[in-house]
């Protein structure tokens, strides 16, 4: 090859390499410039929410609580339309205050009537009826709002005329209406069955009782009207049903059922009614009579069952129905309300219902709440491991913090954390059981003044809910944290006065009477400061109430006062948290036995399962106030105990049954 040709090739290769290098460098500079510009822009970057389609925006807004949805209505026309649809889609017509959680949003898909917490029952109901009137006016004046309502739940005690008015509007103009819940007025039957939209769209069937209370005179036209209503409404489209009569009686004597009902959600009320027996003499169903519930309801479709007993005993027919439900193995949600426990029947029932995901049990004995029998509890542990929601009463043979033995109070401490020690030393012993005679019981006044935990339940400090995660939690009587503290201080003051334990008031003493503190407490570290709401309705957390706060102190005279500081909101919250700590071993049993558990309402205290550091623990839903759990490390302790037991006795491995029995 001539040298000149060789040189030209080398020169061309060099130029190509150089051009490529320059191009790479230029590209790198461009990339760096882009990154710098993007970083600069990202500092002020806001996600363009308005660019989302309406369907996605509705999904985003569905996770907002009611006050935020109301604010969205004021932004612009587009957001107003989306938020309005969410606001009115599902309405809960309550007649008492709904309690909000200070820890999480609960049942936010319901729109509620905003009612104060401290009003008397009659006053609260009057305000609820006034708000219901305004809602009716809104629906009458705005057809677009009426057309988005899908589900409405009515409280029994609201004005019956107003109930009929709103149902008439919805049944005739609510083209989206699908479900009516808690319809208890028989006069509404014709409104629903003849409504322009409800007669074809509503998939729920609520049989209204003859009267608000059982064992009253049944109107003569009740059964004929019910028979007519059944003939108009019973169809294969029904998915939700509420009955006040035994289904076998209903469909053998009053309506000749010819197909199995594919009901998803069934609610049965068991109560005594004095119907005219003439209607239940001759069967009108052709062919063989219905003999068991699986001939009425399709076993494959029934998922939710609620039984509410109004009786103090289980009747023979009611026990037969419980046995019938053993066949419904696809049940996922079971609620047994105000029922007397029958251990053998219920143990047998739970052994068959292995697919349960939700369970609520409220047992009564002579109209007094009764803890779940250990045998029933054990059968649930063994058979229902898929449970995600549990609501029951169970003490696991652990005595209460304030226990009564014969005529004397006893204090039982299960948890020795710093806060629990302060509760026992500074609050229970320092304020409530300050003197030796305080431990003796003479009358009910002693319990009202000193058993703070019983009074939390008696005065309804904690709200009631059908299911705290799915339905609003309502107060069953006027009460909030401020009122509760005031009431307890008044009870304590009256008790101290009756025992001549009040002391002369010291004027201008900024410290008043210091709380009695044990020697051991003096060396303990200070508890975590609890931030407590000072608002009457306990809606917002906005103030720190110091332990010595006397904003709720009661007085009985200008010259005498308590020999100790008054109870404070902080005291009540600390006692409430100590109550949860007290049953640590039971909470651990639930965590061990139910790996899918999300909500637990144990002894009327609602808690939610949270995961921290790869460990599941319970946190209280109400009055959380930076609650400090005593469950941390339970899984490691459990594994260690299981290993030790296995090493000690290889032929006797630990089981859930043994754990429950020991507990």
Swiss-Prot record:
BP GO annotations? protein ubiquitination; regulation of transcription by galactose; SCF-dependent proteasomal ubiquitin-dependent protein catabolic process; ubiquitin-dependent protein catabolic process
- Species source reads Saccharomyces cerevisiae (strain ATCC 204508 / S288c)
Recorded metabolic or biological pathway in which this protein acts:
Protein modification; protein ubiquitination
Can you tell which superkingdom this protein's organism belongs to?
Eukaryota
Q: Which GO terms describe its molecular function?
A: protein-macromolecule adaptor activity
Keyword Manganese listed = no
Q: Function of this protein?
A: Substrate recognition component of a SCF (SKP1-CUL1-F-box protein) E3 ubiquitin-protein ligase complex which mediates the ubiquitination and subsequent proteasomal degradation of target proteins. Probably recognizes and binds to phosphorylated target proteins.
Return the PROSITE patterns for the record.
FBOX
Oligomer and partners? Interacts with SKP1. Component of the probable SCF(DAS1) complex containing CDC53, SKP1, RBX1 and DAS1.
Please identify the protein, giving its name as recorded: F-box protein DAS1
Q: Name one GO cellular component term.
A: SCF ubiquitin ligase complex
Q: Which residues form the F-box domain?
A: 46-91
């Amino acid at each position: 090859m001539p040298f000149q040709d060789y040189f030209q090739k080398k020169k061309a290769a060099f130029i190509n390499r150089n051009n490529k290098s320059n191009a790479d460098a230029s590209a790198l500079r461009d990339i760096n410039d882009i990154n710098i510009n993007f970083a600069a822009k990202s500092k002020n970057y806001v996600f363009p929410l308005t660019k989302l389609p309406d369907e996605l925006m509705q999904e985003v807004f569905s996770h907002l609580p009611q006050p935020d949805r109301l604010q969205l209505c004021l932004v612009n026309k587009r957001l107003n339309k989306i938020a309005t649809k969410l606001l009115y889609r599902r309405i809960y017509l309550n007649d008492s205050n709904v309690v909000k959680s200070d820890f999480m949003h609960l049942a936010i898909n319901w729109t509620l009537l905003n009612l104060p917490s401290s009003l008397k029952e009659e006053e609260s109901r009057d305000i609820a009826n006034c708000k219901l009137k305004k809602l009716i006016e809104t629906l009458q004046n705005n057809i677009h709002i009426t057309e988005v309502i899908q589900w409405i739940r009515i409280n029994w005690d609201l004005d019956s005329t107003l109930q009929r008015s709103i149902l008439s509007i919805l049944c005739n103009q609510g083209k989206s209406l699908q479900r009516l819940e808690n319809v208890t007025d028989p006069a509404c039957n014709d409104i629903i069955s003849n409504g322009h939209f409800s007669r074809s769209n509503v998939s729920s069937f609520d049989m209204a009782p003859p009267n608000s209370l059982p064992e009253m005179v049944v109107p003569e036209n009740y059964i004929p009207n019910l028979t007519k209503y059944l003939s108009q409404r019973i169809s294969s489209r029904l998915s939700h049903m509420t009955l006040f009569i035994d289904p076998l009686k209903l469909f053998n004597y009053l309506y000749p059922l010819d197909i199995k009902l594919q009901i998803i959600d069934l609610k049965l009320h068991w109560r005594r009614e004095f119907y005219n027996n003439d209607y239940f003499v001759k069967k009108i169903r052709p062919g063989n009579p219905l003999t068991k519930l699986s001939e009425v309801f399709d076993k494959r479709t029934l998922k939710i069952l609620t039984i509410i007993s109004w009786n103090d005993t289980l009747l023979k027919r009611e026990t037969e129905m419980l046995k019938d439900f053993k066949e419904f193995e696809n049940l996922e949600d079971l609620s047994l309300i105000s029922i007397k426990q029958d251990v053998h029947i219920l143990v047998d029932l739970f052994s068959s219902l292995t697919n349960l995901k939700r369970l609520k049990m409220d047992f009564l004995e002579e109209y007094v709440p009764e803890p779940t029998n250990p045998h029933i509890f054990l059968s649930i542990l063994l058979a229902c491991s898929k449970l995600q929601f549990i609501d029951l009463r169970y003490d696991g043979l652990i005595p209460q913090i304030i226990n009564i033995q014969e005529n004397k109070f006893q204090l039982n401490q299960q948890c020795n954390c710093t806060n629990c020690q302060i509760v026992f030393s500074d609050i229970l012993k320092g304020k409530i059981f300050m003197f030796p005679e305080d431990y003796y019981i003479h009358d009910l006044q002693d319990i009202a003044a000193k058993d703070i935990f019983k009074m939390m339940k008696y005065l309804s400090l904690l709200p009631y809910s059908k299911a705290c995660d799915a339905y609003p939690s309502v107060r069953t009587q006027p009460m909030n944290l401020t009122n509760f503290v005031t009431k307890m201080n008044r009870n304590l003051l009256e008790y101290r006065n009756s025992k001549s334990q009040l002391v002369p008031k010291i004027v201008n003493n900024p410290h008043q009477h210091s709380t009695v503190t044990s020697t051991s407490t003096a060396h303990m570290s200070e508890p975590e400061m609890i931030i407590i709401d000072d608002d009457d309705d306990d809606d917002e957390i906005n103030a720190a109430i110091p332990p010595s706060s006397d904003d709720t102190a009661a007085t009985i005279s200008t010259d005498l006062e308590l020999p100790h500081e008054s109870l404070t909101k902080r005291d009540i919250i600390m006692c409430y948290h100590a109550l949860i700590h007290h049953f640590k071993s039971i909470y651990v049993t639930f965590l061990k036995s139910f790996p899918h558990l999300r909500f637990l309402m144990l002894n009327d205290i609602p808690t939610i399962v949270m995961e921290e550091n790869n460990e599941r623990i319970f946190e209280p839903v109400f009055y959380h106030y930076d609650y400090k759990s005593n469950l941390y490390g339970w899984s490691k302790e459990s594994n260690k105990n299981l290993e030790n037991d296995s090493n000690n006795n290889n032929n006797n491995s630990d089981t859930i049954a043994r754990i429950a029995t020991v507990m």
